[in-house]
């Protein structure tokens, strides 16, 4: 086993040893503890599980100062950003608690026994039930909202599934601190032992995916790492679902009318979006399509001017810095891509990098230019008309988001919108894609390579659906039915009865 060390990205120096990498025996023990906790957690009422989630939210909030201090030391994301992220993290738990109490996530459905044109139909009652223990992989870029206390963990616990988290190496101290806070809160609120576990190290993560009691995996990270784990999950003797959120280029299109109407405003919005969090958002607009006319050139010039004035930023880890710098060097050998602008030089210490801007044309757009690059850089792509734009978008991989900056009643936008809708899980109009709201209507997903499963979202209340499976009770006596499927439930939920939606009476 090796030491798991917390490193300060501002200096690149180790700060403390947090833990040791987790061996196979310990992974096995944690998974078996999760398996023992699974039926206990599943048997808890919705109200009881909601209380667990609220206890976690309150415990994290109570330790806000300590969490933000440690997370900032490990990520250099800044206290303002991290305070906002912790607020979001606590809000997620509260929202999932409310979703449990409301109950529609169960998709409770009753078809009473009846005569049909196909003959007699038995009494059928169906709803979603917990899948079992879930493995969650923390993300590098969100030490809170997509890590140990993040949305995958919150949605799995809400669904009634124990969780074993693989901590990310970029912020092990933050992960351990949050884990300790959460375990204590869950225990005090009445959760069974084993409901939450944590492992460290890549080998432990792989062992987690292979372990026979793990029934699903939630992952946010790189395309390369995600594909390896996806293949691992698929090659098990009993393949399990792997819900991976991977690479995303997130195209943003500025229409000719929008460029002409508000060039400076659009430029400021684009720069703010692709540099937010040092450009380390999976929803960062990595390709910006501008019309090849006077207005489009004005937007491009304003973006370049803003980039030139930007100070360097600190990235999360050495690997991200290495890949970011390599991407810039590769452009020297690519005649189709031009270096448009660069901000102030990087600091000599730590994982500092300058903000950068690249440029190409729709006709010259290459595969390399459409690959995600973490960090504060985007590629401007100029297009000469609708056909030119369509041809370029056809080269762009499917993404988590696609953005359209347009004017009202613009026919050009009407033509582009269906193209963008087909290639992303979320279509953004006259806004910027970096923010991802926690809500019932959110889709944070998309077709490969954005994710491994286009049917689900990793953000919002319906993220629970990934960790639930449908079960139908046929001709079951009332005493053996879940409360939500009984004729007279103690705690009613929205149900579809004989094909019609029936809401509880309040």
Predicted ranges, named:
Residues 61, 105-267, 271, 289, ...:
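Rossmann-like NAD(P) dinucleotide-binding subdomain of oxidoreductase/dehydrogenase enzymes
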Residues 347-353, 386-481, 503:
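C-terminal core of ALDH-fold dehydrogenases
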Residues 52, 161-174, 195, 238-256, ...:
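Short loop-to-beta-strand entry elements in the cores of soluble alpha/beta enzymes
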Residues 484-506:
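Extended hydrophobic packing segments that form well-structured cores
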Residues 38, 42, 57-64, 68-71, ...:
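Structural signal for hydrophobic packing residues in well-ordered secondary-structure cores
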Residues 1-122, 505:
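N-terminal Rossmann-like NAD(P)+-binding subdomain of aldehyde/semialdehyde dehydrogenases
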Residues 268, 290-400:
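NAD(P)-dependent aldehyde/semialdehyde dehydrogenase
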């Amino acid at each position: 086993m090796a030491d798991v060390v917390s490193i300060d990205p501002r200096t690149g120096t180790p700060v403390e040893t947090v833990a040791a990498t987790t061996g196979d025996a310990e992974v096995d023990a944690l998974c078996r503890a999760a398996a023992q906790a699974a039926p206990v957690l599943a048997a808890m009422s919705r109200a009881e599980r909601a209380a667990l989630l609220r206890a976690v939210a309150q415990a994290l909030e109570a330790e806000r100062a300590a969490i933000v201090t440690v997370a900032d030391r490990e990520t250099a994301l800044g206290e303002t950003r991290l305070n906002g992220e912790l607020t979001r993290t606590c809000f997620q738990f509260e929202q999932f608690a409310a979703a449990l109490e409301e109950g529609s996530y169960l998709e409770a459905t009753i078809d009473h026994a009846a005569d049909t044109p196909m003959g007699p139909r038995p009494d059928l009652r169906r709803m979603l039930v917990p899948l079992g223990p879930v493995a969650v992989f923390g993300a590098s870029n969100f030490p809170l909202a997509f890590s140990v206390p993040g949305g995958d963990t919150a949605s799995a616990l809400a669904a009634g599934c124990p969780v074993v988290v693989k901590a990310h190496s970029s912020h092990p101290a933050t992960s351990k601190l949050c884990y300790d806070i959460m375990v204590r809160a869950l225990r005090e609120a009445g959760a069974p032992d084993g409901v939450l576990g944590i492992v460290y190290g890549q080998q432990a993560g792989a062992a987690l995916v292979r372990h026979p009691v793990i029934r699903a995996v939630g992952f946010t990270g790189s395309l390369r790492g995600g594909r390896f784990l996806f293949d691992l999950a698929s090659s098990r003797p009993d393949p399990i679902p792997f819900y991976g959120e991977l690479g995303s280029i997130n195209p943003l299109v500025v229409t000719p009318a929008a460029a002409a109407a508000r060039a400076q405003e659009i430029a400021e919005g684009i720069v703010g979006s692709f540099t937010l969090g040092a450009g380390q958002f999976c929803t960062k607009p990595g390709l910006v399509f501008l019309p090849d006319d006077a207005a489009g050139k004005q937007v491009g010039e304003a973006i370049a001017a803003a980039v030139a004035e930007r100070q360097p930023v600190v990235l999360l880890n050495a690997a991200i810095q290495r890949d970011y710098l390599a991407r810039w060097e590769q452009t020297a050998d690519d005649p189709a891509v031009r270096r448009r602008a660069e901000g102030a030089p990087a600091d000599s210490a730590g994982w500092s990098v300058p903000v950068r801007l690249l440029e190409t044309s729709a006709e010259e757009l290459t595969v390399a230019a459409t690959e995600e690059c973490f960090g504060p850089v985007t590629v401007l792509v100029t297009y000469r008309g609708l056909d030119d734009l369509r041809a370029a978008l056809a080269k762009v991989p499917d993404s988590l988001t696609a953005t359209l900056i347009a004017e009202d009643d613009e026919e050009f936008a009407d033509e582009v919108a269906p193209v963008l809708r087909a290639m992303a899980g979320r279509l953004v109009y006259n806004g910027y894609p970096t923010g991802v709201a926690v809500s019932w209507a959110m889709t944070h997903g998309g077709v490969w390579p954005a994710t491994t499963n286009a049917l689900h979202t990793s953000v919002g209340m319906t993220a629970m659906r990934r960790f639930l499976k449908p079960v139908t009770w046929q001709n079951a006596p009332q005493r053996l039915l879940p409360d939500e499927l009984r004729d007279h439930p103690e705690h009613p939920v929205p149900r579809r009865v004989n094909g019609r939606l029936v809401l509880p009476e309040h």
